[in-house]
């Protein structure tokens, strides 16, 4: 897995390394101030290339989805005023390469199922339980978009 991650910049496999501890502290600060954190070039060039090749190879088997939902993945609720996110829809027209299509040696599967990434994220979210999402279609997927596809603004429901 270390060849998938840019382990020089992100030595997440060395839990007590000062560089890893600083990465966690910086990410926690970003989360506190902005609600998100950014890990530029987290994947190594090899890892990025391997994931891209895998996604391209499996693209033709992607599950298509074309729906209208609220940003909460629900049907509109007209008890809310017009324009309210609970009473407005956005279009979700994308295709997903799901976990069940990924081989056992898939680079993204190795990253997701390995303990290093889970431990790293758990360490930067102290006190929060963190589990892998086990749904074979909902977890660990590549989102494939073609011309005119769109993924409307929404709140994520999983990892």
Where are these regions (language model features)?
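Non-heme Fe(II)-dependent double-stranded beta-helix
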Residues: 2-33, 40-120
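Conserved hydrophobic/aromatic beta-strand scaffold that supports enzyme active sites
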Residues: 36-38, 142
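Catalytic core of non-heme Fe(II) oxygenases with the double-stranded beta-helix
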Residues: 100-109, 113-159
């Amino acid at each position: 897995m270390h060849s998938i991650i840019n382990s020089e910049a992100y030595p997440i496999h060395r839990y007590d390394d000062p560089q890893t501890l600083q990465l966690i502290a910086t990410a926690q600060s970003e989360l506190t101030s902005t609600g998100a954190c950014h890990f530029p070039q987290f994947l190594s060039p090899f890892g990025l290339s391997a994931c891209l090749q895998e996604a391209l190879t499996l693209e033709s088997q992607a599950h298509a989805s074309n729906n209208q939902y609220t940003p909460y993945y629900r049907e509109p609720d007209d008890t809310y005023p017009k324009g309210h996110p609970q009473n407005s829809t956005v279009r979700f027209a994308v295709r997903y390469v799901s976990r069940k299509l990924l081989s056992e040696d898939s680079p993204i599967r190795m990253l997701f199922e390995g303990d290093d990434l889970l431990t790293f994220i758990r360490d930067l979210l102290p006190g929060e339980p963190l589990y892998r999402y086990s749904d074979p279609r909902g977890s660990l997927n590549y989102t494939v978009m073609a011309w005119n596809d769109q993924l409307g603004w929404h709140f994520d429901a999983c990892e």
